[in-house]
C-alpha cells in the first residue's frame, strides 16, 4: 500500500485529509488477510506518534480496527514516543498528545518505546558508536520476537496474547507498558561473561535496559510479565523472581492492591540474532528474558510531553496548520 503524498508531520493531515483517502483500501486489505487466518488472536500495530502518518493515520486505523473487530480481537500497539533530547519535528508534542487520546480508547495494550533510550542501549551495551535505525529496529525486534515466541514455539509455560493482556492491564485505560530486554551484550563481551538466569533477571529491572526514558524506581509496579526464552528450567526462573522480591524490594515495589505482581512465561526456543551485515554487534545467547511492566513511572513520559505541549499551545503556536486540515480548535487541541 502506498500513497502519493506524506502527512507533513501533521496529525490532522494524516487523520483527516490524506488518511481518509487510504483508510478504505487499507481496511479492505486487512479484512482479506484476516479471512485467511485460521485462529486470529489479534493485531500488532507498529508506528511512531511524533510524525503525521504514525500519529494521524495510525489513530484512524486503530479506530477502524476497533469498529470492525470490537473487543473480540486484541490490539497490541508498539508506539515510538518522542525522546527528551532527540527531536525530529517541532510539532511532535501536538501529534503525540492527539495520538495518545486515540491509543487510550482504541488499543488493548500499548508498548512504549523511545529512540533515545534504545540509542543509549546500543552505545553502552553493544559498543556501537553511531547506531543506525537498523540497529535500533533489531533491538526492538528481540522484544517482539520474545512476545510472540509462545505463539510460534512449544514451551513449559507458554503465554498467548490474551494471557499477556489479562496479566498486564489492571484497568482498561491503564494499558501503557514499558519494555526491557536482557542480555544485550556484544560478541566480544559474551565470550568471557557467564549469563545466568539471576543475572539477566536483575538486568531487565535496570534503568539502563528499559526502552523508554524514565526512572522506574520512582514509580510503583502494578503488574510485571517476565518472558524467558531458551535453556531455562522453571525452578530457576521462580528462584530469580523470588530474589527480586527479597533483594530489590526497595526499588521494585508493587502497589498494595497487587501483591503477587509477577507473571512468568518460559519458552524453549533459543533467542536468535541477525549477525553481521550492518555492523550489528549483538551476541547470540543461550537464554534471554523480556520484561513487560505496567508501572506508574510511565507518567514521567506523559508529563514531559504535556509540558512541551502546554508551552506551545498557550501561545497557539502552529495551531493554524491543524485547523487548516479540517480540525476544530476545540477538538483535542
From Swiss-Prot:
Q: How is it modified after translation?
A: Undergoes a tyrosination/detyrosination cycle, the cyclic removal and re-addition of a C-terminal tyrosine residue by the enzymes tubulin tyrosine carboxypeptidase (TTCP) and tubulin tyrosine ligase (TTL), respectively.
Task: State the GO CC annotations.
Answer: cytoplasm; microtubule
Q: Name one GO biological process term.
A: microtubule-based process
Q: Which UniProt keywords apply?
A: Cytoplasm, Cytoskeleton, GTP-binding, Hydrolase, Microtubule, Nucleotide-binding
Q: Which reaction does it catalyse?
A: GTP + H2O = GDP + phosphate + H(+)
Subcellular localization, as worded in the UniProt entry: Cytoplasm, Cytoskeleton
Q: Which domain of life is it from?
A: Eukaryota
- Quaternary structure per UniProt? Dimer of alpha and beta chains. A typical microtubule is a hollow water-filled tube with an outer diameter of 25 nm and an inner diameter of 15 nM. Alpha-beta heterodimers associate head-to-tail to form protofilaments running lengthwise along the microtubule wall with the beta-tubulin subunit facing the microtubule plus end conferring a structural polarity. Microtubules usually have 13 protofilaments but different protofilament numbers can be found in some organisms and specialized cells.
* Known role: Tubulin is the major constituent of microtubules, a cylinder consisting of laterally associated linear protofilaments composed of alpha- and beta-tubulin heterodimers. Microtubules grow by the addition of GTP-tubulin dimers to the microtubule end, where a stabilizing cap forms. Below the cap, tubulin dimers are in GDP-bound state, owing to GTPase activity of alpha-tubulin.
* UniProt-recorded name of the protein: Tubulin alpha chain
Please give the organism.
Dictyostelium purpureum
